[in-house]
From Swiss-Prot:
Keywords: ATP-binding, Ligase, Nucleotide-binding
Protein family (similarity comment): Belongs to the ATP-dependent AMP-binding enzyme family.
Region (SBD2): 355-417
Keyword Coiled coil belongs to the record: no
Provenance organism: Dothideomycetidae sp. (strain 11243) (Fungal sp. (strain No.11243))
Protein name: Acyl-CoA ligase frbB
Listed PANTHER family: BCDNA.GH02901 (PTHR24096:SF422), LONG-CHAIN-FATTY-ACID--COA LIGASE (PTHR24096)
Highest rank taxon of the organism: Eukaryota
Induction of its expression: Expression is positively regulated by the cluster-specific transcription factor frbF.
GO MF annotation, one: CoA-ligase activity
InterPro entries: AMP-bd_C, AMP-bd_C_sf, AMP-dep_synth/lig_dom, ANL_N_sf
Applied relevance: FR901469 inhibits the activity of 1,3-beta-glucan synthase from Candida albicans and Aspergillus fumigatus. With minimal inhibitory concentrations (MICs) against Candida albicans and Aspergillus fumigatus of 0.63 ug/ml and 0.16 ug/ml, repectively, FR901469 displays greater inhibitory activity than other 1,3-beta-glucan synthase inhibitors such as, WF11899A, echinocandin B, aculeacin A, and papulacandin B.
Lineage: Eukaryota, Fungi, Dikarya, Ascomycota, Pezizomycotina
Region (SBD1) residue spans: 284-354
Length: 561
């Protein structure tokens, strides 16, 4: 058995002991830092500009916990987490995070629902979990009600997480439903709750969130994300960057949905290490760029599709003052070397930090150090992360530059999926997580092992027995300036078994389709082997179906093909 490990340790001062719910631990970090020196607030709401300080958040968590206890008849030390569940179907708001921490204060858990989900998807998740209420926004209320109709009016209670007026549809009239702000005001008048009796051992494995998987290859599954997993991922990330950050805290950008593992992990990791998060309700290019200058944001957490848009429209980077930016972290989808080169050319002083992770891994599993960027790499394994690469023959891949499916172990991994007869256990009998991603290790010029994530097992295309990685072909196609976005899938072929097909979104002024089709085929055939050739299997589309984190939904494209 060949096991690849992180070269970085976790310091002795960085404890993985879960002595309280993860949100409480994060606030304690901020409060401790504030006693030593001036610190920035954990969260800034970009819409209002309001800074949320740790003391204020702590009080609001307590007030909401009090009122939830009264509303639902809950007590901190009575019942199990599964007796105290709420669903959150919302855009990003600071109260989204505070509400979840209030539920944790009562020993409960939260079912997270992507704001892009349909009524049917929401109903399917709600049907599997007994929720006391669903918290949503006014713009999402109609979909919420449709989902409840599918379940005969369950859950009975709906509460509103307020969003800025400018996010409301034109002519919208607010409902008369109780808001979280009103709940917090009521909670402030109620008696204090008894302390939560937290068991550090059992608390490590206690479920904090039910988080939907991306659903890129099929129906969403509900992953059980634990308090211990979230804390571990925060500690792993801090330890990974200890050398280059030297304990410095940063102001970071986040528009990634808090219902997605990437956004949720950031919310807890940044808070746990004392950073300040500038939180957006969702991605809006003009608003995002403006906030970087307004709040002097230092670190950008992005996804490759947005980086692609910026590199293809470089004037956007000159519209506002971006002098505060020092680093860009990217994940949720492959970050090809051509994209990395494009951004590095435009902003050579920015540290590019591609990473890799997945819902089942509990967030980030690898990250590029600021001082060891390698184009095309997904970075270095986080401390305490172990990886095996399993070949098609079921044997461990040995050495570097040998591909295999990534099996991993880490204290951050989920506790499995919510039980479903149709959901396969993602773990092997000896505890390795089968990620479904294909990767390999290469050594950087500095002599450090980097992980390269090549593609998904489910997405690999078999042409005459030869494997074609869609991500490799996609990265190659994106070298053409006429292509804005692309997704490649495999389609049946009588002679070859399968062949690649490309769905392409054209860039502006791309020219006639037939001419572009010819250019694409010449480009591919001149540089890639015959199994990669597209021929007539090129379809031009106005846009690609995507998940809330920006991944192309290839299951939708396969159904269309």
């Amino acid at each position: 058995m060949v096991i690849f490990k992180s070269p970085l340790p976790v310091g002795q001062h960085q404890s993985l002991e879960v002595i309280a719910p993860v949100g409480e631990l994060a606030l304690n970090v901020h409060l401790a830092l504030a006693k030593q020196h001036e610190v920035k607030p954990p969260f800034i709401d970009v819409m209002s500009g309001k800074a949320w300080h740790a003391e204020e958040i702590r009080d609001r968590v307590d007030h909401l916990a009090r009122v939830l206890a009264k509303q639902f008849g809950w007590q901190p030390n009575v019942g199990t987490p599964w007796d105290k569940v709420v669903a959150i179907y919302s855009y990003n708001t600071v109260d989204f995070i505070i509400l979840s921490w209030a539920v944790h204060r009562l020993g409960g858990l939260c079912l997270l629902l992507h704001s892009t989900s349909s009524a049917g998807e929401i109903a399917a998740h709600l049907k599997r979990v007994q929720c006391a209420a669903i918290f949503t926004n006014e713009p999402l209320l109609a979909t919420t009600r449709k989902a409840r109709e599918l379940l005969n009016g369950e859950p009975q209670k709906i509460f509103i997480l307020d969003v800025a007026n400018e996010l409301l549809p034109e002519g919208h009239v607010n409902s008369d439903l109780t808001t979280v702000e009103q709940l917090a005001q009521k909670g402030a008048e109620l008696e204090a709750l008894e302390p939560l009796k937290w068991d550090a051992v059992n608390g490590r494995d206690q479920v904090a969130y039910l988080c939907p998987t991306s659903g890129t290859s099929g129906a969403q599954k509900l992953a059980k994300v634990t308090h211990g997993g979230l804390l571990a991922n925060a500690v792993q990330t801090v330890a990974h960057e200890l050398k280059t950050n030297q304990g410095k805290t940063e102001v970071g950008l986040n528009f990634l949905p808090c219902s997605h593992i990437y956004g949720m992990m950031l919310s807890h990791t940044m808070a746990t290490r004392g950073d300040c998060m500038v939180l957006h309700p969702f991605f809006d290019l003009k608003r995002v760029l403006g906030s970087i200058a307004r709040f002097r944001i230092e670190r950008l957490y992005l996804v490759p599709s947005i980086i692609s848009a910026l590199t293809r429209n470089p004037f956007l980077l000159d519209m506002v003052d971006l002098s505060s930016v020092t680093s860009v972290v990217t994940g949720a989808a492959p970050f090809g070397s051509s994209l990395a080169d494009g951004l590095h050319t435009l902003r050579p002083k920015w540290h590019l930090q591609p990473g890799w992770g997945l819902t089942e891994g509990g967030g980030a599993s690898s990250l590029t150090p600021k001082d060891d960027f390698v184009p095309g790499s997904s970075g270095v394994l986080l401390p305490l992360t172990e990886v095996r690469l399993i070949g098609e023959d079921g044997k461990d891949a040995e050495g570097h530059e040998v591909r295999g499916e990534i099996y991993m172990k880490s204290p951050s991994v989920i506790a499995g999926y919510l039980e479903d007869a149709n959901t396969q256990n993602p773990f092997t009998e000896d505890g390795w997580l089968r990620t479904g991603d294909i990767g390999m290790f290469k050594v950087s010029p500095k002599g450090v092992e980097h992980l390269w994530v090549v593609d998904r097992v489910k997405d690999m295309i078999k042409v005459k027995g030869m494997q074609v990685a869609p991500a490799e072909l996609e990265a190659h196609l994106l070298l053409l300036p006429q292509i804005a976005e692309v997704a490649v899938i495999g389609v049946a072929d009588k002679i070859s078994g399968e062949r690649p097909k490309a769905f392409i979104v054209q860039a502006k002024n791309a020219g006639p389709e037939e001419q572009l089709r010819e250019t694409i085929n010449q480009h591919v055939e001149a540089t890639l082997s015959e199994p990669h050739w597209l021929g007539k299997r090129i379809e031009f589309v106005n846009d690609l179906p995507k998940t809330s984190s920006g991944k192309a939904m290839k299951s939708v494209l396969r159904a269309k093909a």
